[in-house]
């Protein structure tokens, strides 16, 4: 029996070492236990939802043949604000003739922005023939003013990875400009990127676009042109154009004169860095203090491993100042088709510096415009702190979307970013960015919640009003989920150990409360950085007699306590002790009474004895597991990098040197006959005229030598 237990223990431990589950989550909630509101649109056909705009009270959602106006508080539809726009029958039939399905040949709204006060521009796929309409708000409803072609602004396919951002009534878009999707471009009428120029755009998948300073930034992933000599690989990029770029002189009027791009480096450092190369989503630009007194503007990005690799996801933060610095740095150039991409010498860069924002780019010299066409690639953008702030390796899911509730205030006047991360299996992770004071790293505390009932991928995430509320957008469903889990904790210890800046323990009410519901922090207990619960009261099973200055309170405590005379001090089930002053809860130290040294009586009941028996049984079981672990440890060494969620490959070039012979199989010092213990039932081989024992060309060490033979 003991042997069986030992064997099963070893197997269990080996299985755990083979694949460690995601045990870092503080709290895991099932879909049914999450408070949420749902919106399903037509609930029959695919909608391909996308959030077009959001304000303090409403959220505009693009779907199949219409724009929905939803309340951001409960996702109820304001039908007076709905805009219907189906494709015409002619466009639908032409789409069917091109080989598309009926679901493809609909008008999926992808773009909405305000061109001027009181007017909206809406663009849709329109059965693979993009169109844009201008709506004017008159007499309480939106009326169509004009309709124009949307090629270059809106994608043909609702599932195509496109992005757009408006500035000063103009739309900057990143999409494709043909039916097949083979002409990607970054466009603002009339300027666009070069046609069929792989050095500018090479099969990109656009993720997000933001306006910052004098520039519009685009985040995307594409096939790396600088790696083509070695194979095919995907790199993450950030590209920029000037907001007021008017194009170049002469034939370059419809081309950008400020387009530059750089690789986003998200890697785990080491002798051979491990890269997360495929960007999936970015947050908005947020501002805060991260391990310094200076305020920084950063943007969070989700980057993953390729789809055919082991599932790995990482979150890297990039400082906007670093991105701007890279675009002011060295240009990269390939001398010949077989050359490496190297920095361009400074003396070969024309003046004024190409790619800068100028008042009128149409008067730039031709050499500047031509230089920027062929030298759009810059050096890499480093991640903040030089490494990801969160890494997750999982066979079950990958990160797909991210949004940030920036600089949430704690009761200790700390400001921390709360991140919401969507996955491709319908879950939302809540993570807290906790800067460490003396290290260049960020710690995270994570909570995982299942939001979509059928595991549909999360496409978008948006912050909603209220602590912990987030809008989760899927392909055919939108949910307003409350990821504030304060009320689920009933003990001070559990509440504090959540390390959630939204939650704190109210010592006055004995409740785990959301901070936005209280008016005073006086009685709150919270420790987001360490999760230290020393400030908590003892569990309710421990009866404490608290003596305060008020006589009425003293009488109440004496009345509710157990008389010491009625207890037998020799009874081993009775424990008497004195509380130390250090155990006094600071929250209870008020101006009225304060804390006093008091006697603590603890009585162990029958329930306590049952718990002791269970604990002893569990300890006995784990003793067998520990024995198995000891045996297993002899054959399984610990990871050299216990804190890393991956195993870094170290390929030492000197592995065959003298000091590395320990890795090689020792050579035999004498000849070994490998044919031993041949079964008698084995048929004897046929005799020939080659008697090995008579072959003098076989050396004693067993090495065969080439000989000449003559056959008659």
From Swiss-Prot:
Record topology, Extracellular segments: 21-601
Gene3D superfamilies tied to this protein: ligand-binding face of the semaphorins, domain 2, YVTN repeat-like/Quinoprotein amine dehydrogenase
Membrane in keyword set: yes
Positions bearing carbohydrate: 42, 69, 161, 265
Cell compartment(s), UniProt: Membrane
UniProt keyword terms in alphabetical order: Developmental protein, Differentiation, Disulfide bond, Glycoprotein, Membrane, Neurogenesis, Signal, Transmembrane, Transmembrane helix
GO molecular function list: chemorepellent activity; semaphorin receptor binding
GO biological process: axon guidance; positive regulation of cell migration; semaphorin-plexin signaling pathway
SS bonds (residue pairs): 95-105, 123-132, 242-357, 266-316, 486-503, 495-512
InterPro entries associated with the record: Plexin_repeat, PSI, SEM1A_sema_dom, Semap_dom, Semap_dom_sf, Semaphorin, WD40/YVTN_repeat-like_dom_sf
Residue intervals annotated with topology Cytoplasmic: 623-712
Cellular compartments per GO CC: plasma membrane
Signal sequence segment: 1-20
Keyword Manganese: no
Family per record: Belongs to the semaphorin family.
PANTHER family, A to Z: MIP07328P (PTHR11036:SF131), SEMAPHORIN (PTHR11036)
Summary of the function given for this chain in its UniProt record: Plays a role in growth cones guidance.
Protein name: Semaphorin-1A
Organism: Tribolium confusum (Confused flour beetle)
């Amino acid at each position: 029996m003991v042997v069986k237990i030992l064997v099963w223990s070893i197997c269990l431990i080996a299985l755990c070492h083979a694949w460690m589950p995601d045990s870092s989550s503080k709290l895991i909630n099932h879909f049914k236990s999450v408070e949420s509101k749902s919106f399903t649109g037509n609930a029959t056909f695919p909608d391909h939802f996308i959030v077009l705009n959001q304000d303090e009270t409403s959220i505009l959602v693009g779907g199949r043949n219409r724009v929905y106006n939803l309340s951001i508080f409960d996702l109820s539809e304001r039908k007076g604000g709905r805009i219907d726009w189906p494709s015409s029958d002619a466009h639908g039939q032409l789409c069917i003739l091109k080989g598309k399905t009926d679901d493809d040949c609909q008008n999926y709204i992808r773009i909405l922005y305000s061109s001027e006060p009181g007017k909206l521009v809406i663009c849709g796929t329109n059965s693979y023939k993009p169109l844009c309409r201008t709506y004017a708000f008159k007499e309480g409803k939106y009326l169509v003013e004009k309709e124009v072609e949307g090629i270059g602004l809106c994608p043909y396919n609702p599932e195509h990875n496109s992005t757009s951002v408006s500035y000063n009534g103009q739309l900057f878009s990143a999409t494709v400009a043909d039916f097949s999707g083979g002409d990607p471009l970054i466009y603002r009428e009339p300027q666009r990127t070069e046609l069929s120029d792989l050095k500018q755009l090479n099969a990109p998948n656009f993720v997000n676009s933001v306006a910052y300073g004098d520039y519009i930034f685009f985040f995307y992933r594409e096939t790396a042109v600088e790696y083509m000599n070695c194979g095919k690989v995907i790199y993450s990029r950030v590209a920029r154009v000037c907001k007021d770029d008017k194009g170049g002189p002469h034939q370059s009027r419809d081309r950008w004169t400020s387009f530059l791009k750089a690789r986003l480096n998200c890697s785990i450092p080491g002798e051979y860095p491990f890269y997360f190369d495929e960007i999936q989503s970015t947050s908005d630009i947020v501002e805060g203090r991260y391990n310094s007194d200076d305020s920084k503007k950063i943007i969070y990005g989700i980057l993953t491993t390729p789809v055919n690799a082991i599932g790995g996801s990482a979150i890297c933060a990039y400082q906007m100042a670093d991105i701007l610095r890279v675009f002011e740095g060295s240009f990269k150039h390939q001398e010949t088709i077989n050359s490496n991409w190297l920095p361009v010498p400074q003396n070969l860069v024309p003046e004024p510096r190409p790619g800068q924002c100028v008042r009128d780019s149409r008067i730039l010299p031709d050499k500047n415009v031509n230089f920027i066409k062929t030298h759009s690639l810059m050096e890499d953008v480093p991640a903040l702190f030089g490494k990801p702030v969160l890494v997750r390796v999982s066979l079950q899911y990958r990160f797909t979307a991210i949004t940030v509730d920036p600089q949430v205030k704690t009761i200790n006047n700390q400001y921390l970013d709360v991140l919401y991360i969507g996955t491709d299996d319908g879950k939302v992770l809540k993570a807290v960015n906790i800067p460490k004071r003396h290290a260049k790293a960020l710690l995270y505390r994570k909570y995982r919640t299942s939001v979509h009932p059928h595991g549909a991928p999360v496409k978008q995430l948006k912050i909603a009003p209220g602590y912990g509320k987030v809008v989760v957008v899927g392909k055919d469903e939108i949910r307003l989920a409350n990821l504030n889990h304060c009320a689920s904790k009933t003990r001070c210890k559990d509440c504090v150990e959540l390390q959630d800046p939204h939650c704190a323990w109210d010592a006055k009410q004995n409740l785990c409360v959301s901070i936005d519901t209280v008016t005073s922090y006086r009685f709150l207990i919270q420790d987001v950085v360490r999760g230290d619960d020393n400030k908590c009261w003892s569990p309710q099973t421990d009866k404490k007699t608290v003596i305060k200055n008020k006589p009425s309170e003293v009488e109440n405590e004496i009345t509710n306590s157990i008389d010491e005379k009625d207890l037998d001090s020799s009874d081993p089930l009775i424990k008497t002790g004195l509380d130390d002053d250090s155990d006094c809860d600071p929250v209870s130290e008020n101006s009225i009474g304060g804390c006093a040294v008091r006697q603590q009586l603890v009585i162990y009941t029958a329930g306590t004895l049952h718990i002791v028996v269970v604990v002893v049984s569990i300890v006995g079981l784990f003793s067998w597991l520990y024995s198995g672990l000891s045996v297993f440890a002899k054959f399984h060494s610990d990871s050299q990098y216990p804190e890393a969620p991956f195993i870094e490959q170290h390929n030492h070039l000197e592995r065959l040197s003298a000091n590395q012979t320990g890795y090689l199989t020792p050579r035999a010092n004498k000849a070994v006959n490998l044919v031993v213990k041949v079964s008698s039932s084995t048929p004897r081989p046929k005799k020939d005229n080659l008697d090995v024992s008579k072959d003098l060309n076989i050396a004693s060490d067993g090495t065969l030598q080439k000989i000449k033979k003559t056959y008659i």
